[in-house]
Amino acid sequence: MASNMDREMILADFQACTGIENIDEAITLLEQNNWDLVAAINGVIPQENGILQSDFGGETMPGPTFDPASPPAPAPAPSSSAFRPVMPSRQIVERQPRMLDFRVEYRDRNVDVVLEDSCTVGEIKQILENELQIPVPKMLLKGWKTGDVEDSTVLKSLHLPKNNSLYVLTPDLPPPSSSSHAGALQESLNQNFMLIITHREVQREYNLNFSGSSTVQEVKRNVYDLTSIPVRHQLWEGWPASATDDSMCLAESGLSYPCHRLTVGRRTSPVQTREQSEEQSTVVHMVSDSDGDDFEDASEFGVVDGEVFGMASSTMRKSPMMPENAENEGDALLQFTAEFSSRYGDCHPVFFIGSLEAAFQEAFYVKARDRKLLAIYLHHDESVLTNVFCSQMLCAESIVSYLSQNFITWAWDLTKDANRARFLTMCNRHFGSVIAQTIRTQKTDQFPLFLIIMGKRSSNEVLNVIQGNTTVDELMMRLMAAMEIFSAQQQEDIKDEDEREARENVKREQDEAYRLSLEADRAKREAHEREMAEQFRLEQIRKEQEEEREAIRLSLEQALPPEPEEENAEPVSKLRIRTPSGEFLERRFLASNKLQIVFDFVASKGFPWDEFKLLSTFPRRDVTQLDPNKSLLEVNLFPQETLFLLAKE
């Protein structure tokens, strides 16, 4: 299998020989032939033109080598290439199945899968199902350069390179804990990531600190400042598969914490790679006339002479620790950290990347248990003590460890007058004019300085100003002495904070109990008011019904015909009616009166006939069921009768 450099050269020669300008199509044809250039050309060029044999194969025929004593070989025709026809009797080697390597990332796991390109996407998912214990229907396999693909898609049809990075999403499966995930993400946003970035061309490492809220794009822009490689020409290795978007925060990109290694280089064109290979080779290759045009267009790939020579010269001179008049303090500290690492090695304090105000927030404006001291390192390149202080004291493992555990370390370079004036302004604003004057009057040979700051309720107190003419033991003793003062103050702050939280908890509990009591009283009062309103409504309905019944009773009573005398010329019927209470109602009616008059009489006494019924004994019958328009004589209620009133069911 050809190396990456050989593949670039094979790709360029294949396009030159076949005239195929589409790079994707050319790569596909080469991969189908396992990057066998001769086999790929034979598959495109008709067989009558002869079978080609390449100098890349293991069975190459001896070609002319460069010999200073020998006369130069005649130049070939413009259409000639680095290949020469041989007899058709060359036996083509049987093509081996092409294997594809996949690295699949799922949460905190990486699974390596190796399959033939004749397999399908679904077979990858089946392997992942056994490894990750995730059902295939619940699994989304992402990271394909062509977009989403079906499970039945054959890998060969995707024209994939040999090494591929994919990742698995499971939107239908609940995460381990959404709240814990959100908490972990918030914690990652507040963390600082150390990126160890290797510049491939110059074999130089940069140690850069970034906050979790920084984006991938910001990292690439900062690397451009250090390496002079524009972002569009940067070729990266080491980013996690999930870091697919330059706008993604580092906390979400899947970087290893606290350190992550990356490699960056300059993206080169296939033509440049081939020309470099030809310069190193002792075999004379005949190239086509079009290569000259390709060389003239090499600037399209970002190769500028000034950049190349500037890169070489930058490694020879000493770069400043911090740019002058930097607009952003975070960017200035990124360069400071990178330059500090390049001068004194990777073992150094973790410098906080951000403004001085942000360092205050990180150190002081948190819970009392989480507070730390703030150490401000003031650098000066022109001091004779700087190199010794940085290399032997500040980078000592004991000092680095102690600072990392107990301090937030912030740095600034006072070499340039503009940066010095800027820091004195910050110092005057945050620490007062006394400290600013102390730093202003320091001589160059007294630098570097190490300021130990402790946050208090109303102001920030400078506990100690350590000059560069010290030793590791003395520096450690002064750091520990500052830590003792801070620890005593921290314990008081923790006690005050706990007492304040206890008081606030009691107050919250009392407020909650009072609120619940008010709600209970209000609910009780509202229930009583509803009950009284309901009783009033029912009483009103009852009164209205009684008034209505009384009005009906009076109207019926007034409408009754007068009671006839016992001695009357017309026949008289005497009725005796027993009420449910046992009382008797007696009245005389004319035998010719209708039965309705009897009903009206009973209703006028408070027994409406729609609620009560009249029963006779012999024969037993319900009189209210009879025709009310018939006379008493017709219904046999003559000359006298006893009736009973019963309430209807």
Swiss-Prot record:
In-chain residues carrying the UniProt-annotated modification Phosphothreonine: 579
Primary subcellular site in the record, as a coarse category: nucleus
Tissue: Central nervous system.
Disulfides per UniProt: none
Keyword field contains Transcription: no
Domain UBX: 568-645
Pfam family of the protein (one): FAF1
Location of the UBA domain: 1-57
InterPro entries named among the record's database cross-references: FAF1-like_UBX, FAF1_2-like_UAS, FAF1_UBA, Thioredoxin-like_sf, UAS, Ubiquitin-like_domsf, UBX_dom, UBX_domain-protein
Source domain of life: Eukaryota
GO terms for biological process, alphabetical: apoptotic process; ERAD pathway; Fas signaling pathway; negative regulation of canonical NF-kappaB signal transduction; positive regulation of DNA replication; positive regulation of extrinsic apoptotic signaling pathway via death domain receptors; positive regulation of protein catabolic process; positive regulation of protein-containing complex assembly
Keyword entries, A-Z: Apoptosis, Nucleus, Phosphoprotein
Residue segments, region Disordered: 55-84
Location in or out of the cell: Nucleus
Residue numbers bearing the Phosphoserine modification: 319, 581
Molecular function terms, GO-annotated: heat shock protein binding; NF-kappaB binding; protein domain specific binding; protein kinase binding; ubiquitin binding; ubiquitin protein ligase binding
GO cellular component, one term: endoplasmic reticulum
PANTHER family named among the record's database cross-references: FAS-ASSOCIATED FACTOR 1 (PTHR23322:SF96), FAS-ASSOCIATED PROTEIN (PTHR23322)
Quaternary data: Interacts with CDT1 and ATPase VCP/p97. Interacts (via UBA domain) with FAS (via death domain). Interacts (via UBA domain) with NLRP12 (via DAPIN/PYRIN domain).
Annotated function: Ubiquitin-binding protein. Required for the progression of DNA replication forks by targeting DNA replication licensing factor CDT1 for degradation. Potentiates but cannot initiate FAS-induced apoptosis.
Record's protein name: FAS-associated factor 1
